[in-house]
């Protein structure tokens, strides 16, 4: 019997065997309700109208941009207006043939990381093609452009001790992640604003390592960076330039080298990031730059070192795509014509297209719930697949449809899209005048 104090509870007094048969005191547990935490998080995005629902589709070889939609009611034909296979190269016979031949020759996977048996001859050929494309000494292939941006920017900051990154305010999430993971200093300059950029550069010591990180084509607004002016500032203030050309490679320039090639300033850019998954229609990402930079990233970047390399068939398909687009300008010319035509037709229909000089066609909605409603009705009623673009991909209040015309979209496809959008805009509570004012 306990004397001179409070009585112990059953939990405090009970003893149970420990790991080695010795008793230990039982303590009261207040477990975290993990399921509730996750369900609450999901409820928040549901309530904001930005819960993402994936459309289950199957692309049909030779029929792009047509696809088959799978849902509980069966399989139905759809026209895809939101693919990032911008030129349709994912369906090109040369790409498919190269991939089939690689699989038949060497099998499916690479068999290892790049350091441990995963550097196949296909990877070596691919990096040589990319270095040639950008007229650089070297290139380095990653499993995705997100990984390439993330691990390269983080590694640059770790290698350049005391460095600071100057980042455009509209940079992609992969660049933001890399800058954050680098753990160094950063400053953000106003979008495409060289006056603001110079003000920030001028405030830094000349001897301090500096990296200017920016994109050529910004994927949500379609704006294009003043690359020449930014490179001139980099030279003036002793900074490295890191340019993301993900939404430009394959699609701009005489050989598909991107906006920097188109503008004649590729040689002024220190590091170019690109993708193999958009203009080239396959998968993967890369950087291209000097031999020393690429070798340093190869040797230090965890996102490159500690992962299995791309499948040989993917590398083979990418090589075929790059080689084709280096000599063929037909896809690029048709792509630009289709983008101009779609913008003109949407504007003529009174729809609030965000004007820009690139192939991106954003149509402003400004409300996440309405944006989702419009895209659902496009898909269910008209067989037109457009994915809604909501926060955090774009700022709240700027929710939009992001249309991506390809060389393979026909005038008839545009007729159906414009007619459907006009009808839905009249039906949904979207004020065109308000949205025009918001541009």
Predicted regions and their residues:
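Substrate-binding/gating loop at the entrance of the active-site cleft, primarily
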Residues: 144, 166-182
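PLP-dependent enzyme catalytic core of the Aspartate aminotransferase-like
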Residues: 7, 22, 86-89, 93, ...
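Conserved PLP-anchoring active-site segment centered on the Schiff-base-forming lysine
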Residues: 152-173
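N-terminal "arm"/small-domain region of PLP-dependent enzymes with the aminotransferase-like
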Residues: 31-106, 239
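Conserved N-terminal alpha-helix of the aminotransferase class I/II PLP-enzyme fold
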Residues: 96-144
């Amino acid at each position: 019997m306990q004397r001179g104090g409070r009585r112990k509870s059953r939990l405090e007094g009970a003893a149970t065997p420990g790991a080695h048969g010795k008793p230990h005191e039982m303590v009261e547990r207040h477990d975290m309700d993990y399921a509730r935490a996750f369900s609450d998080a999901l409820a928040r995005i549901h309530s904001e109208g930005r819960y993402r629902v994936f459309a289950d589709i199957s692309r049909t070889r030779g029929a792009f941009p047509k696809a088959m939609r799978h849902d509980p009611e069966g399989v139905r034909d759809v026209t895809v207006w939101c693919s990032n296979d911008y030129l349709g190269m994912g369906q090109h016979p040369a790409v498919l043939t190269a991939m089939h031949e690689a699989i038949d020759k060497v099998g499916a996977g690479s068999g290892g990381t790049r350091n441990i048996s995963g550097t196949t001859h296909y990877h070596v050929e691919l990096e040589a093609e990319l270095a040639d494309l950008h007229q650089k000494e070297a290139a380095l292939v990653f499993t995705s452009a997100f990984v390439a941006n993330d691990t390269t920017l983080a590694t640059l900051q770790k290698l350049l001790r005391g460095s600071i990154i100057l980042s455009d305010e509209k940079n992609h999430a992969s660049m933001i992640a890399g800058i954050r993971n680098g753990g160094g200093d950063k400053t953000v300059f106003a979008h495409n604003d060289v006056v603001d950029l110079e003000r920030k550069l001028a405030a830094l010591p000349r001897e301090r390592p500096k990296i200017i990180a920016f994109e050529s084509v910004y994927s949500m607004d379609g704006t294009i960076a003043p690359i020449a002016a930014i490179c001139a500032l980099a030279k003036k203030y002793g900074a490295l330039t890191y340019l993301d050309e993900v939404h430009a490679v394959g699609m701009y320039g005489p050989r598909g080298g991107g906006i920097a090639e188109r503008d004649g300033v590729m040689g002024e850019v220190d590091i170019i990031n690109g993708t193999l998954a958009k203009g080239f229609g396959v998968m993967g990402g890369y950087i291209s730059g000097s031999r020393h930079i690429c070798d340093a990233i190869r040797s230090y970047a965890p996102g490159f070192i500690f992962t299995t390399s791309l499948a040989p068939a993917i590398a083979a398909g990418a090589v075929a795509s790059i080689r084709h687009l280096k000599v063929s300008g037909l896809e690029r010319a048709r792509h630009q014509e289709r983008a101009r035509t779609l913008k003109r037709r949407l504007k003529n229909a009174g729809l609030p297209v965000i004007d820009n000089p690139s192939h991106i066609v954003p149509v402003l909605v400004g409300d996440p719930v309405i944006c989702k409603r419009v895209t659902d009705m496009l898909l269910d009623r008209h067989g037109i697949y457009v994915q809604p673009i909501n926060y955090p991909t774009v700022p709240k209040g700027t929710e939009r449809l992001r249309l991506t015309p390809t060389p393979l979209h026909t005038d008839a496809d545009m007729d159906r899209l414009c007619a459907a959008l006009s009808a839905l805009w009249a039906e949904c509570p979207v004020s065109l005048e308000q949205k025009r004012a918001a541009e």
